[in-house]
Amino acid sequence: DSKSFFYSKLDKFHRPRQIYKHVVGTPIDSDKLIFEEKDETFTCGISLSTDEKFFIISSSDHITVEEYFFPSDTKSIKPVLFQKRKKNVRYSLDSWKEYFYIQTNEDARDYKILRCKINDINKLEEFIPPKKETVIGGLEFLDNFIVRSEKSDAIHKIFVRDIKTNQEEEIKISEEAIGIPGASLMQKDRNTSKIRVGWESMKTPGKVYEYDILTK
């Protein structure tokens, strides 16, 4: 609402374990505590989902994650638990249009992607299944496409999925497929078919390509 913001407060050991809401122009002692992590081995933080519809609170230690969410347009803040923490299970929640997307290592050592309708978080479906000896990376959302990455045998690959057809294909920047040790996506405008891909190999200096998904 441009009138307030959230911040985390450190405990005596300088670990963020509380999240407050501050309204600009009001005294700090009137700030509202919206979340507190009771477990001293966990820390917490807050972020905005890709579509900016939800704030997501993430509480974690080095091996376990638990996340909460609440609508960004609400005045009555009541964080909702997405999935109760399970030892050694990490997950990351994001939202895009009518879905929550979840990157998780539960029953998938190298991660997988699940999704569910925003209004039915208990009905999860597999979006990107786990692959043997392949690390499944995160997602980048455009209005008509979903871009994702994966890594196997030290080679990074980038895939584009058409949201309407659900068809997916790999982006190939170069025939030099023996090594793509670093690939990144940089995107601000979601209403586009163009993405920027950072690419380099053992014998090719780093470059940034603009890639049009429609014209290739």
Located regions from the model:
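Peripheral, non-catalytic segments that deliver or gate enzyme domains
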Residues: 1-216
